[in-house]
């Protein structure tokens, strides 16, 4: 295999990928829930993943205090990223409102088409009741006249 300084190697891309891979591995390790076997024996049980053999029954009082809901993180948003997220949320809410309006308009159009078809069918039934079946006087192609092929 060619070395790092070989001419035909996409060196920068390769180095960037390996760097990103190692960073993502570290990030995943920080964010994943630790198993009991990977932590110390005296670690609090609420911070580790449950074992499959652990009981799923709920104890009323275990003596441990529950963890607070607010968790302090070291990840901060830059001003630019915060603006981008706010802008995207605004666009998403506008898009959802537009989709709701379009759905309502679509339902109105479908109802009007359905009403037109219903009206046409009822008119046809009423005309049939008033006038009877319509028969053409020429009778071409019917059993009343001469069949021609």
From Swiss-Prot:
InterPro entries in UniProt: Ribosome_bgen_Alb1
Renumbered to this chain, the Low complexity biased-composition regions fall at 30-41
Name the residues that span the membrane: none
- Region Disordered, as annotated, extends over 1-58
GO BP terms: namely: ribosome biogenesis
Q: What's any one GO cellular component for it?
A: cytoplasm
Between which residues do disulfide bridges form? none
Q: State the source organism's domain of life.
A: Eukaryota
Tell me one Pfam family matched here: Alb1
Q: What is its main location?
A: cytoplasm
Question: What start-end ranges are recorded for coiled-coil regions in this protein?
Answer: none
Leader sequence residues: none
- According to its UniProt record, which protein family does this protein belong to? Belongs to the ALB1 family.
What subunit structure does UniProt give?
Answer: Component of the nucleoplasmic and cytoplasmic pre-60S ribosomal particles.
Task performed by this protein: Involved in proper assembly of pre-ribosomal particles during the biogenesis of the 60S ribosomal subunit. Accompanies the pre-60S particles to the cytoplasm.
Q: What is this protein called?
A: Ribosome biogenesis protein ALB1
* UniProt source species: Lodderomyces elongisporus (strain ATCC 11503 / CBS 2605 / JCM 1781 / NBRC 1676 / NRRL YB-4239) (Yeast)
């Amino acid at each position: 295999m060619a070395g790092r300084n070989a001419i035909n190697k996409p060196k920068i891309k390769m180095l960037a990928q390996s760097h990103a891979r190692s960073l993502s591995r570290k990030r995943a390790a920080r964010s994943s829930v630790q198993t009991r076997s990977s932590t110390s024996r005296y670690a609090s049980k609420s911070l580790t993943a449950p074992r499959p053999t652990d009981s799923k029954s709920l104890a009323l009082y275990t003596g441990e205090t529950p963890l607070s809901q607010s968790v302090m993180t070291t990840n901060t948003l830059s001003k630019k990223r915060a603006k981008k997220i706010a802008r995207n949320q605004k666009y998403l809410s506008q898009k959802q409102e537009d989709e709701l309006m379009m759905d309502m308009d679509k339902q109105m159009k479908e109802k009007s088409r359905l009403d037109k078809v219903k009206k046409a069918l009822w008119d046809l039934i009423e005309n049939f009741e008033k006038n009877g079946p319509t028969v053409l006087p020429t009778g071409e192609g019917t059993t009343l006249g001469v069949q021609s092929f």
